[in-house]
Amino acid sequence: MKKCSVILAAVMAAALCAPAVSQIAAQAAEDAPVVGFWSTEEGVTERPIADGTTETYAESDRKWQGLPTIAVTPGGRMWCAWQTGDAIEGSEGPNNYDVMYYSDDNGKTWSNEYMIWDVPDDSVRLADPRLFYDQFGKLWLVLIRGGLKGAYAVEMKNPDCEDPARNLETGEPISWMKAPPAHRPTILSNGYWITPVEVDTDAQQTYICRPDNDAGKYPWTTTTSQPAVTAYPDNKTFGEAQIVELSDGSLMMLSRLPRDCGGGMEISYSYDYGTSWTPYKADNGVPYISPSSKFHIQRLESGAILMITHATTADREQLAAYLSYDDGKTYPYMLMLDDTDIRGSWRDFGVSYPEAAAQQGENGEIYIVYDAGRYGLKEIRMCVVTEEDIKAGKPVTQYCRMREQISKLGGYLDYVDTSEDYERYITVQPGTEKSAILAQLPASVTLIGEDGSQLPLTGEWECLDYAKNIEGRYTFEFSGKVTGKAQDLYSLLKVYVTVAAEKEEPSDPSDPSDPGTPEKPSDPADQKDNGWIIGVSVGGAAIVLCALVAAVIVIRKKHSASRKK
C-alpha cells in the first residue's frame, strides 16, 4: 500500500473525531509532492517504512529530531517546525518527515495537536523545513523533498485563526525551486527574494525571485549575466550559505567551512543585488569561528546584524549570539545562549542549527530556536533575548528566557543527582599544582536518575588550559562518556577552580557573618547549592574550598516539556 493511501485513510478517520483535518488541497491527490494533516498522541496514524514494517507518527516512535524553524504571526502566535522520524538523519535516508507545533502564550507552552508533513514516496524524505514571511504578509512553509530533489512551498492562509487544527487553511503545495535552500530567503530592499542553494555536491548557486503577488507567481531564476556559482574545494561538499543585506545595499554571503579546511566560514560580497559575487574568502576570526556547523545571520529592526553561531571551533557547543553595528566588520557584543556539553557520541550533534524568527516581539524580543542532542537529549530548545541582553553579555531584561524546551522525545533518562561528595567550587593559591586539585576529585561518579536508577561512570578530570600561576577561573570536566543522556549532565560533571591570591584567613569559618567568609560564587548552575567548607590544606598548598557540605549534589531539571491542553 502506498503511504499516501494510508495517510488519506487516516485523514478520513480523523475527520470523524477531534481534531478535524485542515483544508489541504494536495492531500486528495495521489501524485501530491507532499501531504499534510493534523494529529495528536491519542490519535496517531500508521505509516509504512522502508523495511516493510509500519510505525506511527507518535512522539514515542520518533528516534531523533532537529533543524527547527520559527515564525511569529502578527497576532503573536508562534509556529515552530522541525525534522524528525525513525531514520538516522545523517544517513540522508527515507522515513523522515516534518512536524509543526504552535504556541499562543509567547512560547511558554506548545500545542499537543501537531501538523505532520510527509511525502507519498517511501524512497525520499522531507528535510529542513523553513517558515518564511514575505513582504505581502503571507506565511510560507518551505519543505525540502529528498536531499537535492528540490523544495516545495505551502502557504498558510490564516495562521492566526482560532483552533488551528480545525480551521487552518493551507494552499496547495507548489514547486518552490529545483535545488534545496538551507535558510529562508532574504527579502532585499528592492523587493526581490534571494537565497543560495546547493546545486549539487560540488557547487553552489544563487537563486533570485521577483515575486508578483497580484498574479500569484513567485518565479525563481538563477543569476544569468555572471552566474554566482562557487566550485567547492575537494573536501567541502556543502556550505548552507546565507545572505544579509548591508546598509549600503551590498550583500554579504556567508558559508560554513569543514574542519579539514580550517573551520570557520567563507565570505563573499555582491554589489549588484546578487547577480555577481566576489570570490569566497575564508575567515575563522570571531564570530566566524565555526566548528563546521550551520549558523544564522539577519538584520534586526534596529539595523544591527545578529549572528548566531558557536564560540568555538572544537565542537558544536557554546552556542552564542553576537551583535554588529557596523555591517559585520566587528562584533563587540556576545551572549552565551547555551553551553550544554553533549559530548561522547558524534551523533549527539551538541547544540546546533539555530534560527531566529524574522519577527521580533513588541519589546524587542528575539526568538531563537535550535536543537540539542539530536539523538541523545532529543530536544528542540528556545531562547528569548533582547539586544540589551546581548550587549550586557548576560540576561538583564525581564523578557530574557534561556534554554526552554519546546519539545523533548523520550528514550533516555534525565540524570539529576550524583552520589559522590566532591567540591564544585574551589579557590586555590597561585602556584597550586593541578595534581593537588585532581587528588580531591573522585575517579568514578555515579549518576542518579529521576526514577532512582543509577549509572556508574569511570574517567578522569581534566582542564587543558589550567595555568597554575595565572589568576582566573578554570573549568575541570569529567571525561566519563555519556552520550547526551541528561539535560543537566554538563553541570553535574564540572568543577570550577579559581586561582586567586588568598587575602585573609577567616577567623571563624562556621560564622557566615564573619567578614572573612569568602563570598559564594555567582553561577547560575549553583543556584540551589547550600553549605560551605573553608580552609582545607592539601599537600602543603593552601586550598580554600567553597562548596557543598551535602553528600549529594542536586541539580534539578531546568525545564520540563509542557503541552498546551
Language-model features: locations:
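Bacterial N-terminal signal peptides
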Residues: 9-19
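Sec-dependent signal peptide cleavage junction
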Residues: 17-30, 531-532, 551-558
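Serine/threonine-rich, repeat-prone extracellular segments and beta-strand-based repeat modules
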Residues: 451-499
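Single-pass type I membrane protein transmembrane segment
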Residues: 533-544
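C-terminal low-complexity, Ser/Thr- and acidic/Pro-rich disordered "stalk" regions positioned immediately N-terminal
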Residues: 501-531
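Solvent-exposed, low-complexity, repeat-rich "mucin-like" stalks and linkers
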Residues: 407-453
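C-terminal membrane-anchoring or membrane-association module
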Residues: 545-565
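Asp-box/BNR beta-propeller blade signature and adjacent active/binding-site loops
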Residues: 30-410
